[in-house]
């Protein structure tokens, strides 16, 4: 399957079903009480990490993913059915990001982990809920709430314990073949590896871990040069970084240490937290004549005196056992570093992402010629919840607007009798 690590699409939770307006009717009971049932809740959009998936190709082909709407209430106090949740399965290691703000909505970092990202709308109440001693036959009902809607980007960041980084042709793929069961393509040209390659390695102490051969980096990668951002993002989840150096002299006069500093700089520019990860220096291609002639081992040890250094040959598998043991030792204490801190609620065992609602003031707009427009989140919720299709709902709609303070605001702005006040799709005549 083609490796796709980003996909953009929209998600839409189901709307809640409308409450019903109905009355009990039976022989010899012409004026029975209200018995309109509630609407069902809309289905939610839930993301689930699936260890069997390795690409976002199927999501790349989608434009919108929608959960089912809740069903409307019915007569005889029958409640509408709940809309079915939509489960969206993604590879382990996928981030779900809100497009407009860049906010991370979910970090799918564990197999079977579920996160509710778009919550379904609550079902509206039927008229049976509004009966009281003053109004025994109400025609009041609520419309179902609108389900949440987001434009999102899914971004797969490979989940591995160890990441091999270095310049193109440093021998990372050959080294991965030497220490694992992975068979990445190997050739003598730059950017042989265009996608992360994973392998499972076992050290002599019996410990096992996942190693990622990450595509070669070049100067400017942190700014996106040479597909830098596509490569660097996969390093963020690795608990240990193995920096592979080419000791063969293939870079001519370029100094091995300067090459290291170049790549290290790109890592930190991309994400400063990468500077905190444990690092092992892997001096590779020690089997070559150039490596023997250059006699750089002492210089390398001196420069990296505060780091663990291993001299290996991926081609001949020389000293790879020592490398594996050093990696295993580092992993004993290397902690997983979360990419974000998510405040979450728990909803039926599923982690739920809660967007913080913006505090938006009510907006009064004077359109001129006796026309006004009212807007804002508070007003929209009233407009959406109470359709003015019955006399009782019209009275309740006006009462809710009054309590919101919008009437006082209109008076302060100079609204007069006979003026038209537009509340979204409704046009109301001011009667003061």
Curated annotation (Swiss-Prot):
Enzyme Commission code: 3.6.5.-
GO BP of this protein: ribosome biogenesis
Gene from which this protein is expressed: obg
Cofactor(s) needed for function: Mg(2+)
Cystine crosslinks: none
SUPFAM superfamilies assigned to the protein according to its UniProt record, in alphabetical order: Obg GTP-binding protein C-terminal domain, Obg GTP-binding protein N-terminal domain, P-loop containing nucleoside triphosphate hydrolases
All residue ranges annotated as the Obg domain in the record: 1-159
Localization: Cytoplasm
The protein's name in its UniProt record: GTPase Obg
Organism: Mesoplasma florum (strain ATCC 33453 / NBRC 100688 / NCTC 11704 / L1) (Acholeplasma florum)
Keyword Metal-binding appears in the UniProt entry: yes
Binding site for Mg(2+): 173, 193
Binding site for GTP: 166-173, 191-195, 213-216, 284-287, 313-315
Organism lineage: Bacteria, Bacillati, Mycoplasmatota, Mollicutes, Entomoplasmatales
Domain OCT: 354-432
Alphabetized Gene3D superfamilies for the sequence: GTP-binding protein OBG, C-terminal domain (3.30.300.350), GTP1/OBG domain (2.70.210.12), P-loop containing nucleotide triphosphate hydrolases (3.40.50.300)
InterPro entries: G_OBG, GTP-bd, GTP-bd_Obg/CgtA, GTP-bd_prot_GTP1/OBG_C_sf, GTP1-OBG_CS, GTP1_OBG_dom, GTP1_OBG_dom_sf, OBG_GTPase
Single GO cellular component term: cytoplasm
Source organism superkingdom: Bacteria
Record note on quaternary structure: Monomer.
């Amino acid at each position: 399957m083609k490796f796709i690590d980003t996909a953009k699409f929209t998600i839409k939770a189901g709307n809640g079903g409308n409450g019903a307006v109905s009355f009990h009717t039976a022989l010899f009971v012409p004026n029975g009480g209200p018995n309109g049932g509630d609407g069902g809740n809309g289905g939610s959009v839930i993301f689930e990490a699936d260890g069997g998936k390795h690409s976002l190709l199927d999501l790349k082909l989608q434009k919108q993913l929608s959960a089912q709407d809740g069903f409307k209430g019915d007569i005889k106090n029958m409640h509408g059915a709940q809309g079915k949740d939509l489960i969206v399965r993604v590879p382990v290691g996928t981030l779900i990001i809100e497009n407009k703000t860049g906010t991370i909505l979910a970090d799918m970092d564990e197999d079977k982990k579920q996160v509710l990202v778009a919550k379904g709308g609550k079902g509206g109440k039927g008229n049976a809920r509004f009966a009281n001693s003053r109004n025994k036959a109400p025609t009041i009902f609520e419309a179902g709430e609108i389900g949440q809607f987001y434009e999102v980007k899914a971004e797969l960041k490979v989940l591995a314990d160890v990441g091999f980084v270095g310049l193109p042709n440093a021998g990372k793929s050959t080294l991965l073949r030497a220490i694992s069961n992975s068979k990445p393509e190997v050739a003598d040209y730059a950017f042989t590896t265009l996608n992360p390659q994973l392998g499972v390695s076992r050290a002599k102490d019996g410990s096992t871990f996942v190693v990622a051969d990450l595509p070669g980096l070049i100067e400017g990668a942190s700014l996106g040069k040479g597909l830098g951002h596509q490569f660097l993002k996969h390093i963020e989840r690795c608990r240990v970084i193995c920096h592979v150096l080419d000791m063969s002299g293939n870079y001519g006069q370029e100094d091995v240490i300067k090459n290291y500093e170049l790549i290290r700089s790109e890592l930190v520019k991309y994400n400063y937290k990468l500077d905190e990860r444990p690092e092992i220096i892997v001096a590779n291609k020690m089997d070559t004549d150039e490596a023997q002639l250059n006699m750089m081992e002492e210089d390398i040890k001196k420069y990296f005196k505060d780091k663990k250094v291993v001299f290996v040959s991926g081609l001949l598998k020389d000293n790879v056992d020592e490398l594996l043991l050093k990696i295993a030792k580092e992993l004993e204490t290397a902690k997983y570093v979360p990419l974000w801190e998510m405040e979450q609620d728990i909803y039926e065992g599923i982690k739920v992402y809660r967007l913080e609602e913006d505090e938006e003031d009510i907006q009064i707009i004077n359109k001129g010629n006796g026309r006004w427009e009212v807007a804002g989140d508070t007003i929209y919720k009233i407009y959406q919840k109470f359709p003015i299709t019955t006399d009782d709902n019209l009275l309740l709609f006006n009462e809710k607007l009054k309590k919101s303070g919008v009437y006082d605001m209109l008076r302060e702005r100079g609204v007069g009798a006979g003026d038209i006040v537009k509340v979204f799709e409704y046009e109301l005549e001011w009667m003061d």
